[in-house]
Amino acid sequence: MIHLSILDQAPVSKGESPVTTLQHSVELAQLSEQWGYKRYWFAEHHSTKGLASTAPEIMIARIAAQTNTIRVGSGGVLLPQYSPFKVAETFRQLEALYPNRIDLGVGRSPGGTTKTRLALTDGVKKSLTEFNRQLQDVSYFLTDSLPPDHPYAGIKAAPLIGTAPELWVLGLGENSARRAAHQGIGYVFGHFINPERGENAFRIYRESFRPSAHFSNPSALFTIFVICAKTDEEAEELALSQDLWLLRVGKGLDSRVPSIEEAKAHPYTASDKKLIEENRKRMVIGSPTTVKQQLLDLTGCYETNEIMVLCNVFDFEAKKESYERLAELFL
């Protein structure tokens, strides 16, 4: 059986308020639970007008309170910018409020420009090379298993209850897969960012996995942009707004999701068209028949049975319909 989950970046459409965007996130999470989705995760992005999810832990609390069974999590917390102890306590707090429903996905991404990173850490310069140590510390705190010789031995990440959040690592290749495997935690491959290295990353994860207090067996999924419409032609039209938005993001432009009309009128250069063609490798677009076959091909290639999808189209109604069609295909 294929499981479906959602990664919500809370993309803001042009002409829409972030307030409305976040209200849409609540509605979509409630609907996705009804449709049978397994998880609903929020991304973390800073100093941008185009994405409204800056604090996934707050969105998790909101969504978990408005739903009943779907797992809710982060995709992911920018661990290099924070204290592992604080992150662990925040997610233990959420787990105490919503037992067996909380996922802690963490990433190594610096989180933006150098200035943004310094603002996040209040001027303290942190190194990405500390990520392995930070990840291990989060794992220790979540499982209350700090070694006796650890500098923080005796410290407890509260509240202490009988369950703990699931711990996942987000990554784009072999190093992150190996890191997750060696620590016995879940692995999320970002196909929607880098579609080239997934097969090898999943193979390394499976072959190198060491059972842990988090997972006894390898647990992996991949994230991908998906637009599922009635026909291939309709899906292609819906994708125009996402194409232009990704093009602008790739150029470092802080952009909200444009309308289809704006995308059609945009003066694309030959270089733009080539970039859009490359970006299409990061997504699956088409009718239900087209989408189902392509996603099944990917799950077979990656040898996983869970897909986490994003759909950053302009129109919210079209977005809902895409997610519902996906559910009808697999759930």
Curated annotation (Swiss-Prot):
Transmembrane domains' residue ranges: none
A GO cellular component annotation in the UniProt record: cytosol
Gene Ontology MF terms: oxidoreductase activity, acting on paired donors, with incorporation or reduction of molecular oxygen
Pfam families in alphabetical order: Bac_luciferase
SUPFAM superfamilies per UniProt: Bacterial luciferase-like
Recorded superkingdom: Bacteria
Family that this chain belongs to: To bacterial alkanal monooxygenase alpha and beta chains.
Protein name: Uncharacterized protein YceB
The organism of origin for this protein: Bacillus subtilis (strain 168)
